[in-house]
């Protein structure tokens, strides 16, 4: 019996100092201590804010000022800050300022975009740093905001240690690091670049997320950090990841050295496996993965880095597509259920050291009036499915301001349903979240604090870790969750069945790549054109105890169907392929999965398993399961094994019914039907 007692999720607002200030109030000085951003008294701090860009186009598409008019730019943007902080009353604690290349590029010189530095003029940057960016930073601080300044423009598609863009960043930050108006201001921080995509790895290949690329990325930014420190700049520095600021696992192995280092993250719908109504331009994405898919991606990329340093989300927003007023297109949704925003907050709060912001235009934030809407009459400002309505109240919660009273609190599991079920199917190698969720009558969720006590009957199958149940093995386990909120004690017991390949909605994804279809009732699925359907395992699936992985379809096909396995959590990496050809069965030898380059796949951590086809044809999936006997699958047969043999028992949907039982007792009490016992098909007839 595994028994664990801990506080549920360590909700950020109740465990950290908020560093919330108002105009004229002295702001705490911050520094990095271990994985935390802390104030002078050692209180943990998470910042929450918004962004502002200083160019005519981003200031309401050129309708407010132009022609390098410094005074009009300052007047407009200061008024926007007044609107956000004073008139609308956002409880924000930081602002991300873009030192837009509008000011530093030579006027009239054509560029291909913000990633083109060919028109950069250092003298113009120096001039407008003093005339525009420093005055705006000082004004924001006077409003009670910490300031994060980012360099002009965005990274080109490919960067490399020692290339022109690297030299450009060194030049920009080398100058900034000598400006005492900034370096002697404890409320100013710097984000070293915007959205690196690919970097030339130490192996000479461009990419992102590989060990060679991770090592090169650290070297790239370490050299910039070292230059700034040599100039006497001790400000907090926020380092971006690659993949448009979505990849951070590499920093856990190759961290940036020095003090006052954190990592700047971007989070948009569709990223990290989150739900997107419309795929993001940068990383795509789809809708339907809900909490579990998002949590798996978050665990892979954010949590390893958050274990060593603070994280700050410097771009994120979401609204339903119909409003056309956000970068990200999704909904707030439900914590532990479908949607983006609520699940993001749950994950950020659970991680504990993640600050975040809304990248929605500040001119919109300034128009927010706090008036609730009604069904059928919502606007982008008060729709509970948008980031402004929920974000405004979540910021107030973080800052400790009074909110409507809690109407109800209950325990929920993912995938979320109306109540906690007594029986729960969980995919081996995946996770199920658990949270205490409150309703304040505002149309969206709040996660709350409460004592949680967890007891698990079989920790080899199921493991509890900081609000998450991890399915470690194939089998069954009972989990009893007891909790106390405001003196109310509740206890719920759930029987979990962990199986790797449930042919069920919410587990089998027909659209891992391209839009496919799936009918749970019949088991029929189709892929999109050159698409992929199957299962993803965020924590990795361990099949090292088995010799084979077998997939069966109802009838032969003629559409290029193949069975594929990935041991890297990236669909665009090489995978092992087994063709169906004219057979109804594809059998993968788990001990001998070799790629064309000779690399052997590791069955102890498999992340994506499923089916590729040309698209346009339906296939009826019978079963997918691991086994130790390849030949036994040729047909239904009797089994003759010694009494002391130990076997596992599966139904034909791949659900493990019994694990590690004596062979002579494996079939005892089973209803009539077809089973997999010890890797062989067995027909039970009583």
Regions found by a protein language model. Give the residues of each.
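C-terminal outer-membrane/trafficking sorting elements
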Residues: 633-686
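Extracellular ligand-binding interfaces
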Residues: 525-599, 613-627
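Aromatic-lined substrate-binding rim segments of carbohydrate-active enzymes
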Residues: 70-154, 166-169, 222-231, 333-351
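N-terminal carbohydrate-binding accessory modules
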Residues: 21-96, 107-119
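Bacterial N-terminal signal peptides
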Residues: 8-16
């Amino acid at each position: 019996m595994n028994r664990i007692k801990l506080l549920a999720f360590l909700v950020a607002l109740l465990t950290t100092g908020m560093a919330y200030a108002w105009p004229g109030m002295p702001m705490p000085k911050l520094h990095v201590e271990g994985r935390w951003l802390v104030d002078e008294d050692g209180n943990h701090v998470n910042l929450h804010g918004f962004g502002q860009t200083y160019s005519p186009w981003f200031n309401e598409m050129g309708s407010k000022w132009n022609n390098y008019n410094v005074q009009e730019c300052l007047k407009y943007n200061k008024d926007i800050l007044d609107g956000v902080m004073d008139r609308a009353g956002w409880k924000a604690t930081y602002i991300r300022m873009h030192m837009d290349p509008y000011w530093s590029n030579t006027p009239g010189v054509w560029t291909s975009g913000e990633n083109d530095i060919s028109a950069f003029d250092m003298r113009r940057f120096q001039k407008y740093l003093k005339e525009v960016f420093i005055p705006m930073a000082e004004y924001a601080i006077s409003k009670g905001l910490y300031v994060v300044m980012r360099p002009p423009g965005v990274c080109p598609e490919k960067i490399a240690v020692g290339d022109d863009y690297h030299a450009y960043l060194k030049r920009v930050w080398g100058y900034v690091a000598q400006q005492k108006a900034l370096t002697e201001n404890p409320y100013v921080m710097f984000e070293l670049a915007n959205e690196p995509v690919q970097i030339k790895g130490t192996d000479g290949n461009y990419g992102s997320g590989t060990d060679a690329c991770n090592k090169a990325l650290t070297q790239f930014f370490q050299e910039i950090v070292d230059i700034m420190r040599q100039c006497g700049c001790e400000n907090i520095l926020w380092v971006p990841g690659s993949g448009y600021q979505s990849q951070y696992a590499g920093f856990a192995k190759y961290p940036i050295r020095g003090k006052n280092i954190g990592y700047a993250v971007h989070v948009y719908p569709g990223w990290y496996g989150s739900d997107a109504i419309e795929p993001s331009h940068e990383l795509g994405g789809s809708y339907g993965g809900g909490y579990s898919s998002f949590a798996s991606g978050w665990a892979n990329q954010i949590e390893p880095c958050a274990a060593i340093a603070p994280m700050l989300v410097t771009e994120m927003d979401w609204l339903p597509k119909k409003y056309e007023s956000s970068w990200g297109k999704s909904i707030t949704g439900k914590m532990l259920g479908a949607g983006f925003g609520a699940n993001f907050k749950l994950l950020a709060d659970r991680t504990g050291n993640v600050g975040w912001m809304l990248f929605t235009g500040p001119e919109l934030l300034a128009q927010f009036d706090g008036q609730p809407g009604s069904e059928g009459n919502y606007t982008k400002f008060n729709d509970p499915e948008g980031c402004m309505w929920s974000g405004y109240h979540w910021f107030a919660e973080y800052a400790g301001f009074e909110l409507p009273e809690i109407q109800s609190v209950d325990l929920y599991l993912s995938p979320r349903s109306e109540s906690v079920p007594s029986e729960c199917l969980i995919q081996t190698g995946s996770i199920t979240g658990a949270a205490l969720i409150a309703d304040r009558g505002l149309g969206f969720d709040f996660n709350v604090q409460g004592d949680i006590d967890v007891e698990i009957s079989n920790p080899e199958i199921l493991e509890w870790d900081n609000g998450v149940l991890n399915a470690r093995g194939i089998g069954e386990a009972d989990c009893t969750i007891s909790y106390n909120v405001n003196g109310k004690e509740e206890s719920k017991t759930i029987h979990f069945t962990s199986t790797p390949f449930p042919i069920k909605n919410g587990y089998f994804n027909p659209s891992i790549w391209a839009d496919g279809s799936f009918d749970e009732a019949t088991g029929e699925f189709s892929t999109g054109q050159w698409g992929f359907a199957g299962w993803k395992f965020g924590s990795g699936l361990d099949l090292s105890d088995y010799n084979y992985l077998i997939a069966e379809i109802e009838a032969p096909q003629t559409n290029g169907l193949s069975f594929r396995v990935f041991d890297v959590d990236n669909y665009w990496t090489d995978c092992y392929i087994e063709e169906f050809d004219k057979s109804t069965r594809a059998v993968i030898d788990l001990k001998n999965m070799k790629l064309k380059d000779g690399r052997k796949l590791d069955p102890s951590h498999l992340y994506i398993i499923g089916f590729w086809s040309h698209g346009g044809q339906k296939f009826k999936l019978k079963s997918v399961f691991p086994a130790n006997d390849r030949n036994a699958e040729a047909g239904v047969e009797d089994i003759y094994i010694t009494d002391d043999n130990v076997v596992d028992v599966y139904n034909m949907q791949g659900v493990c019914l019994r694990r590690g039982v004596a062979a002579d007792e494996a079939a005892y009490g089973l209803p009539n039907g077809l089973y997999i016992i010890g890797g062989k098909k067995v027909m039970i007839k009583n």
